[in-house]
Amino acid sequence: MPTAKRTSSRASLALPFQLRLVHKKSWGHRLRDFISGFLKSCRPIAKYVFPNFIVVHYIYLITLSIIGSILLYPCKNTAFIDVLFLAAGASTQGGLATKSTNDFNLYQQIVVYVITLLSTPILIHGFLAFVRLYWFERYFDNIRDISKQNFKLRRTMTLQQRELSGSSGNAARSRSFKDNLFRGKFVSREDPRQSASDVPMDSPDTSALSSISPLNVSSSKEESSDTQSSPPNFSSKRQPSDVDPRDIYKSIMMLQKQQEKSNANSTDSFSSETNGPAFIVQERHERRAPHCSLKRHSVLPSSQELNKLAQTKSFQKLLGLRRDEGDHDYFDGAPHKYMVTKKKKISRTQSCNIPTYTASPSPKTSGQVVENHRNLAKSAPSSFVDEEMSFSPQESLNLQFQAHPPKPKRREGDIGHPFTRTMSTNYLSWQPTFGRNSVFIGLTKQQKEELGGVEYRALRLLCCILMVYYIGFNILAFVTIVPWACTRHHYSEIIRRNGVSPTWWGFFTAMSAFSNLGLSLTADSMVSFDTAPYPLIFMMFFIIIGNTGFPIMLRFIIWIMFKTSRDLSQFKESLGFLLDHPRRCFTLLFPSGPTWWLFTTLVVLNATDWILFIILDFNSAVVRQVAKGYRALMGLFQSVCTRTAGFNVVDLSKLHPSIQVSYMLMMYVSVLPLAISIRRTNVYEEQSLGLYDSGQDDENITHEDDIKETDHDGESEERDTVSTKSKPKKQSPKSFVGAHLRRQLSFDLWYLFLGLFIICICEGRKIEDVNKPDFNVFAILFEVVSAYGTVGLSLGYPNTNTSLSAQFTVLSKLVIIAMLIRGRNRGLPYTLDRAIMLPSDKLEQIDRLQDMKAKGKLLAKVGEDPMTTYVKKRSHKLKKIATKFWGKH
């Protein structure tokens, strides 16, 4: 009985506590717990059924097509193969139809409407962003709270630095470092032995260097290199608490300046050290450094003193003011580590010579030397013997500042570090170091956690932007078109004659334009509206921003939001990260350079089709009855629809044959600009291409069909030949694009011709029938390419308003359905893409591999897009040739 009482009392005491715990969980947390439990139970099967995003995408589209056909078939107003064909076209935005859409009833049209909205690229990739956001919250504990605390800390320290500098923003850079340093309110005390005017802190003191005199050190026996020796005893060395921060700061400046002077006169060997800087490379030969020694009474703090003094307030103020001045020669590459490892061989009678040392980043490094870099630390004099001395702005000195000062004004002629890039805003408390495509190099555990928090907040904001974008532009589309369809009586009558309400026609057409479906509720598509500029112009806009122009519009919106957001806000931090590193968060958001290239490509392709239409069909019989202004608009509308949407404003079968060939080619390349942009901005681009070479530079891997650059001036041909033999050719950005194109062609061509071959077998009798001249191989190829490009254009068949596919047999229609599903997956990223991979141990391993790869290789400069660099280089060479040619004439 007493035992029962004790049990009940314990239960009664524990119950309120358990209820409080359950009460604290939000509905979102409970939903995530339910999803997590369900996924854990399905994990043994799911990892085989859904191994990656590509397979999930295939399964989703096929499932949606089957579900759509099941929902459409109960009306039984058409054969099941035609219903399946329509559902597959809706789920892939193919736009081909074996039966006019207006012949289906309202229920079936609504089903097509919903299926299309659930399968657009924006929705699928946006849903993937939501999944990654959910996984971030499940995989990282308290990531939301930690990232918020880091943001508050960065903002507080930034405001404090602005207050210390006496100004805000860029005005802090106008005050010199020396004037700021020796003000009483910044420095707690002055060095009694030296005045402020004697030693400017932005340059090393030459008198201090001249005061160095020999320090004789002898040993009774030669010490082994693997035994750690104690540093020499300085008679006047002060305790760490007695050393003025200015002394240690000047020591660092002297060390760095002497390193720079040694760069021009010596070539040092670099050993294999994984902790070295990512941009230092290994030389083949070792040289002894010049003999020098330190004065016995000179003061040079040890590394332990550096660690302690670097954390003091006064030293951090000094360094903060130094950074405010804008000189980032020494402290802007925080993640870089300058490791000096001494290889000592000192005899008994030798004086303390500067030992040979090594400094290298990785076990295997390239033999190339970084050019045009002023701060390459190759040598560092030292007075210590048999001791490993390291200088690391982040780890050795613990200089992990929690705020960035205002951005320094770049001095004229100053060449930026090829691995560093100025951040859009202070979303990190340290200056990151990059490789190709936003690869962060040399991160500590604390930095990775901070970066993960910033990426999480950026992804969370991006999800909100995507949701508003998708819903908002769909609403804007039908708000734009529905009132016009209801108020223009002439066109309202045309719509009603097709058995459709003008209001519903406006809703469906707006969705079809923004989703690039290409179906219309009028039997002749948009031919009846060839003289209505209002819907044609707005539909072109929604067609572009709903598909290939989506990354351009999305980045433009984020840029506008960034420019108008409040300074030092969490909102602006996230926007800045999205602008700087978009492909770490989303597959359809690109950096500035690739975005401009995508924009240029779209303009060129559309302009090419438009110009060809004007040249070849402007005065043809099919458009002659329309005014010239409307003809130009029809040509522009058709050129825009040819690549993605599939609407037609003119009968394509009556156009010039060369225009038909041009349209077929444009349908095939429709997805290539977007697909290549996705793949060449992939964070793991090299690994996705299979470039795992670690013994040489990433840029030295070439393909056989790359164009070899030649010297058109005829100079140094023999030298170029020798250099080509001695070292590998340099990998150009064009080579990566070529690799992506070759992969895409190998993915496409065999499938296209296999489908064409099967259809020609099934439709052989119709092709041979002389009474059906419009049923020919070219028309079938046009249909196959249209399906594979998920465009929806068709040459049609005489006296019908449907696609040519309506004349196919059941097997041929199944082949077209397979083309639609396969073609819809053309523009997906590679399996190895950070933007589609969920946070996991596997992702951490890939990041670690990428970091090790980057540390040992000289990656491309990140300040400029590689394709832009390539084009500039080629244009400069062409300009040089043209100048020489015209100079002779």
From Swiss-Prot:
Biological processes per GO annotation: intracellular calcium ion homeostasis; intracellular potassium ion homeostasis; potassium ion import across plasma membrane; regulation of membrane potential
GO molecular-function terms, A-Z: high-affinity potassium ion transmembrane transporter activity; potassium ion transmembrane transporter activity
Comp. bias (Low complexity): 207-219
Segments of this protein annotated with the region Disordered: 189-244, 705-733
Transmembrane segments annotated in the record for this chain: 52-73, 81-101, 110-130, 465-487, 500-521, 525-545, 549-569, 585-605, 610-630, 658-678, 744-764, 777-797
Taxonomic superkingdom: Eukaryota
Pfam families: TrkH
Keywords, comma-separated and alphabetical: Glycoprotein, Ion transport, Membrane, Potassium, Potassium transport, Transmembrane, Transmembrane helix, Transport
Extracellular-facing ranges: 74-80, 131-464, 522-524, 570-584, 631-657, 765-776
NCBIfam families membership: 2a38euk
Reported function: This protein is required for low-affinity potassium transport.
Protein name as catalogued: Low-affinity potassium transport protein
Source species: Saccharomyces cerevisiae (strain ATCC 204508 / S288c)
